[in-house]
């Protein structure tokens, strides 16, 4: 099982971000940690009663927002409380996101003492002009300093988040960003193409013509360069946007793509939990508003969460949607075990059609996207959807 905690506090909201994150709310951090621990205890009690044993967490992920904004004493209280409530595996992968502009040794001390053994830093870009366009508060020298601090504290499993297809970004600038990231010797890189989200300042500037995106050919070249350059440096692609040195693929991410049950705590956090011996999964989502979440916890008004059972058809499609994002692909044997029916019976005709189009390949009992299929993944999934 996997555990996710959402820490929605930010020093400044990035211009492209549509996540549940809030600037200027630092005064609520203590109350928020109280709420997280209360929710953790309640969920642990419920599922321990349902399963007859405590929840064992194989991975833990602190996301945001900016978890590194949490004061060290609050981080210590949170992580200590989680260990009291859950059975966290001794070899658990324990990741925290961090912003290079907010990281300091005291926070890292508390993180390591609480079990954090993997750090994901939001570098995003190398060039100051692009960081300004994104509304980031750091520069590359702060990324370098953060990496040094993390290693000095004993965290050597380091991931960097990068973004391509940005307004004003050229292919040469993207290569420069990759080179800068690689100079820091990370174990993992996440390389995301920008998706301008409605309601964000960046999307408004694009719609107004103030900013413009690279053309499709340039963005494709950026992705091709990512595959070539990272492979040359020993990185293995294990998902469309994720690359790792051997042995350093993110276990938390892999669990999500393989439909491992996960428990989410905090504002906007989602869970997908087994309610009846693998035959009835339920997805629930907490309210996204910070104060709405705190109010829910204070009043114990759990009905403000959205809760929906995952139908068998949804579960089948999610196996394809999530599995095809990975380079491993979708296993015919695993599909049969999970859903009690053959992949060929459910999707055979459509899979073979996509294979004939050069978008899927079939080998060793797995269906995988081809390189061309990665470019049109959404079209592949539309073909696989039920009519």
Predicted regions and their residues:
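C-terminal scaffold of the Radical SAM
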Residues: 1, 21-47, 55-341
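Minor-groove-contacting beta-hairpin "wing" of winged helix-turn-helix DNA-binding domains
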Residues: 366-370
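Short, amphipathic alpha-helical interaction segments positioned at domain boundaries
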Residues: 372-387
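Local cysteine-cluster metal-coordination motifs and their immediate loop/turn environment
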Residues: 8-21
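A short, conserved structural fragment
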Residues: 355-365
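Short amphipathic alpha-helical interaction segments
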Residues: 341-353
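Immediate flanking context of iron-sulfur cluster ligation sites
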Residues: 1-7
């Amino acid at each position: 099982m996997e555990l996710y905690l959402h820490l929605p506090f930010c020093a400044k909201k990035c211009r492209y971000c549509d996540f549940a994150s809030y600037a200027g709310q630092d005064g609520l951090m203590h109350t928020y940690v109280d709420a997280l621990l209360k929710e953790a205890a309640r969920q642990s009690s419920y599922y321990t009663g349902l399963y007859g044993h405590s929840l064992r967490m194989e991975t833990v992920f602190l996301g945001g927002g900016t978890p590194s904004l949490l004061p060290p004493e609050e981080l210590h209280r949170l992580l200590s409380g989680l260990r009291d409530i859950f059975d966290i595996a001794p070899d658990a992968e324990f990741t925290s996101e961090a912003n290079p502009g907010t990281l300091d040794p005291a926070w890292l001390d508390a993180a390591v003492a609480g079990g954090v053994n993997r750090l994901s830093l939001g570098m995003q870009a190398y060039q100051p002009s692009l960081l300004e366009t994104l509304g980031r508060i750091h520069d590359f020298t702060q990324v370098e300093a953060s990496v040094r601090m993390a290693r000095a504290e004993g965290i050597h499993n380091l991931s960097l988040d990068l973004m391509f297809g940005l307004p004003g970004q050229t292919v040469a600038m993207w290569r420069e960003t990759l080179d800068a990231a690689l100079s820091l010797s990370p174990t993992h890189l996440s390389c995301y193409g920008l998706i301008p989200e409605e309601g964000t300042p960046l999307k408004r500037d694009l719609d107004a013509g103030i900013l413009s995106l690279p053309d499709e050919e340039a963005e494709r070249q950026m992705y091709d360069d990512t595959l070539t350059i990272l492979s040359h440096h020993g990185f293995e692609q294990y998902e469309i946007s994720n690359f790792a040195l051997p042995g350093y693929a993110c276990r938390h991410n892999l669990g999500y793509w393989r439909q491992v049950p996960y428990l989410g705590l905090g504002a906007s956090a989602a869970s997908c939990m087994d309610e009846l011996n693998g035959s009835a999964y339920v997805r629930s989502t907490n309210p996204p508003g910070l104060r709405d979440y705190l109010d829910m916890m204070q009043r114990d008004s759990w009905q403000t969460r959205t809760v929906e059972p995952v139908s068998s058809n949804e579960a089948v499609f999610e196996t394809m949607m999530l599995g095809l994002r990975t380079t491993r692909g979708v296993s015919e044997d695993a599909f049969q075990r999970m859903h009690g029916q053959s992949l060929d019976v459910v999707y055979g005709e459509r899979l073979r059609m996509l294979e004939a189009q050069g978008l899927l390949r079939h080998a060793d009992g797995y269906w995988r996207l081809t390189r061309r299929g990665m470019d049109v993944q959404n079209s592949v999934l539309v073909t696989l959807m039920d009519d």
